[in-house]
């Protein structure tokens, strides 16, 4: 089935760009979400989150061939089909109307304006694309589609569940044919943060980076606090220049100068400033659902952040009916109770996306934990989960 972005691009190619002016005017009525960054440290962290590559051009340009891929193969229609997002606030909307942004060379023009969310490029004096790196926002920001599907205002902290990470990686020349087949099999909005170490493939749903304040460990398997995971990803996955050591998993990377560690406090401050988005729900049903939740779910979902992991608790996969394959690749071999924040805004659920809806989540636990819930109780519980 074609994506909303690809359908929009096809339609757009059939209309005169003068007609796009109507969309521009309409989009102008949609205000950009107000930034949550208020302190100097949070503002610094926002810039890091959005635009800092941590020097990873050393890998993506010098080794992986991302420049050639972007320069020769990925034009805007393909970029949107692959789930890349465009920040409309970086566009000159008058020129956007007057010039076809989906023409040959359009991707470079978007990169020159820092408009492709999560990609950072540098250009030569004659306009040639020299280097490309990636930022945190590539996977952990999306847009509100205010202009077109895939083009709108930034939503930092929202996971990009449209991003075809595996397909993009499979287009790079550094992988073997066997590896490319594995990468191409990853569902959109997923990524395996250990594939480059052990070659196994259990892709995880990209998690939200909002609502993290007060959460002790921000990974499905609770390896460490948010700055631990930020460092792990920045250095071992994004291939930034820095130092990361964890003897539990046999990683000892030392690169100087360290372009990651000094930035971790500001990055954490910005992520902690990102609130979980609110959803609509039925007040009466949610109130009844809270009673159901307290009686059946609050054994693990405890405290203000609704996770017993803040008390150091982890759960064997068999205890909650989770697929053990990913946990077995981690030091703890267990899963954390996921904090419940903005749930309705980031389906699918569980580490592997195996629950497509909140109803699926409830039915899963009702079966695994033998919860004797009526259909009405399940519906009320779903409304309560939407309220979190």
Residue ranges with predicted function:
Residues 15-26:
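Bacterial N-terminal signal peptides
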């Amino acid at each position: 089935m074609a994506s909303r972005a690809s359908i929009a691009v096809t339609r757009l190619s059939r209309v005169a760009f003068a007609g796009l002016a109507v969309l521009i005017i309409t989009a102008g009525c949609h205000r950009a979400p107000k930034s949550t960054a208020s302190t100097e440290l949070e503002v610094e962290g926002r810039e890091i989150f959005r635009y800092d590559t941590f020097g990873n051009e050393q890998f993506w340009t010098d080794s992986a061939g991302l420049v050639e891929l972007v320069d020769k193969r990925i034009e805007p229609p393909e970029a949107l089909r692959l789930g890349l997002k465009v920040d409309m606030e970086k566009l000159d909307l008058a020129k956007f109307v007057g010039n076809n942004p989906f023409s040959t060379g359009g991707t470079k023009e978007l990169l020159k304006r820092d408009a492709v969310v999560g990609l950072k490029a540098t250009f030569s004096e004659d306009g040639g694309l020299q280097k490309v790196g990636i930022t945190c926002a590539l996977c952990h920001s999306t847009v509100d589609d205010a202009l077109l599907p895939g083009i709108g205002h930034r939503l930092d902290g929202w996971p990009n569940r449209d991003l075809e990470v595996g397909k993009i990686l499979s287009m790079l020349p550094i992988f073997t044919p066997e590896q490319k087949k594995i990468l191409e099999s990853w569902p959109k909005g997923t990524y395996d943060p250990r594939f480059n170490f052990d070659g196994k493939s259990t892709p995880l749903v990209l998690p939200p980076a909002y609502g993290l304040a007060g959460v002790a460990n921000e990974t499905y398997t609770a390896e460490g606090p948010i700055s631990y995971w930020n460092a792990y990803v920045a250095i071992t996955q994004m291939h930034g220049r820095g130092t990361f050591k964890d003897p539990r998993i046999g990683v000892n990377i030392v690169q100087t100068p360290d372009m990651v560690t000094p930035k971790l406090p500001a990055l954490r401050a910005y992520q902690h400033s990102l609130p979980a988005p609110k959803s609509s729900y039925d007040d009466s049903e949610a109130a009844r659902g809270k009673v159901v939740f307290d009686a059946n779910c609050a054994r693990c979902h405890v405290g203000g952040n609704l996770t017993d992991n803040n008390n150091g608790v982890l759960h064997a996969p068999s205890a909650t009916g989770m697929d053990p394959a990913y946990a077995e690749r981690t030091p703890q071999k267990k899963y954390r109770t996921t904090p419940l924040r903005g749930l309705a805004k980031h389906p699918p659920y569980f580490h592997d996306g195996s629950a497509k809806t909140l109803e699926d989540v409830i039915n899963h636990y009702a079966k695994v934990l033998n919860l004797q819930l009526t259909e009405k109780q399940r519906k009320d519980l779903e409304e309560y989960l939407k309220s979190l």
